[in-house]
Amino acid sequence: MTKGTQSFGMRHNKSHTICRRCGKRSFHIQKSTCACCGYPAAKTRSYNWGAKAKRRRTTGTGRMSYLKKVHRSFKNGFRAGKPTSAATA
């Protein structure tokens, strides 16, 4: 048997499994670290050379249920509470 392409077909064991943080099949079983998000590290793995990867998982790619409302509050000067009586009259 040669040591190149032919021998890759003989492989059966999985080196990576599903990561519980990012959900990708990037969690290395023996190292017990995720190649995608860096789990179990506290901070998410991200590098400047991976600008495209950053774009995929940065703020604005999800629901942003709170941040969507911030723009409207900013327009009104972050005023809270009921309007004054002068405004209603």
Swiss-Prot record:
Species whose genome carries this gene: Schizosaccharomyces pombe (strain 972 / ATCC 24843) (Fission yeast)
This protein's name: Large ribosomal subunit protein eL37A
One protein family per Pfam: Ribosomal_L37e
Transmembrane intervals: none
Gene this protein is translated from: rpl3703
InterPro entries: Ribosomal_eL37 (IPR001569), Ribosomal_eL37/eL43 (IPR011331), Ribosomal_eL37_CS (IPR018267), Ribosomal_zn-bd (IPR011332)
Other remarks on this protein: There are 2 genes for eL37 in S.pombe.
One GO BP annotation of this record: cytoplasmic translation
UniProt remark on cofactor binding: Binds 1 zinc ion per subunit.
Domain of life where this protein originates: Eukaryota
Function: Component of the ribosome, a large ribonucleoprotein complex responsible for the synthesis of proteins in the cell. The small ribosomal subunit (SSU) binds messenger RNAs (mRNAs) and translates the encoded message by selecting cognate aminoacyl-transfer RNA (tRNA) molecules. The large subunit (LSU) contains the ribosomal catalytic site termed the peptidyl transferase center (PTC), which catalyzes the formation of peptide bonds, thereby polymerizing the amino acids delivered by tRNAs into a polypeptide chain.
Residues bound to Zn(2+): 19, 22, 34, 37
Required cofactor(s): Zn(2+)
